[in-house]
Amino acid sequence: MEGFVNRFIRYVKKNTRSDASKAGVVIPSTASQMEFLEELYKELKEIGLEDVKINKNNAFLTATVPANTDNAPVIGFISHVDTADFNAENISPQIHENYDGGDIALGNSGFVLSPKEFPNLKNYIGQTLITTDGTTLLGADDKAGVCEIVSAMEYLINNPQIKHGKLRIAFG
């Protein structure tokens, strides 16, 4: 089972930048988005999800974790794989373990995340933070969602003692 942080880093390094000039004309707006969906297809099959399908007409991947108990509702989880129309080549995430509450330099870009400007950073003292190096976007919107969903489904498949109804997922 791949660790959450490693999976997240692997996902955000994938360039799935949107192309605003193709919005509403081509779905998905870039070929790299479909490539990422195809990689997710393989990963979901390997993890053990069922009914894994990609609809190439609308660029949606769907899959199922079967129920392991009766009388539980079907629950769906949805996330998108495209990222903002901003530099997404050579993404270099930075991992800041045990955040100390101070400024966070974003690589050598000259950009800094400061608790003076972002006071909510103080809520994360002692935690691990993952940021961009300042030269690209990180792509956490919404590869964090994709990572959370895939990791949760893998956990439930590997821990059948946790009872649940049918779980459906969709990525697009």
Regions found by a protein language model. Give the residues of each.
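Electropositive phosphate-/nucleotide-binding environments in soluble metabolic enzymes
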Residues: E2, M34, E38, K143-V146
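Beta-rich nucleic-acid/ligand-interaction surfaces
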Residues: F60-A63, K166-G172
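Flexible, glycine/charged-enriched surface loops at secondary-structure junctions
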Residues: A20, D51-K53, Q161-K166
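Active-site metal-coordination/substrate-binding segment of hydrolases
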Residues: A72-I162, F171
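N-terminal capping segment at the start of a domain
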Residues: E2-T30, I130-T131
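A non-catalytic alpha/beta surface segment that caps or lines the substrate-entry region
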Residues: K22-A72, G76-I78, D82
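Alpha-helical scaffold segments in soluble metabolic enzymes
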Residues: R7-R10, E39, E148-S151, Y155
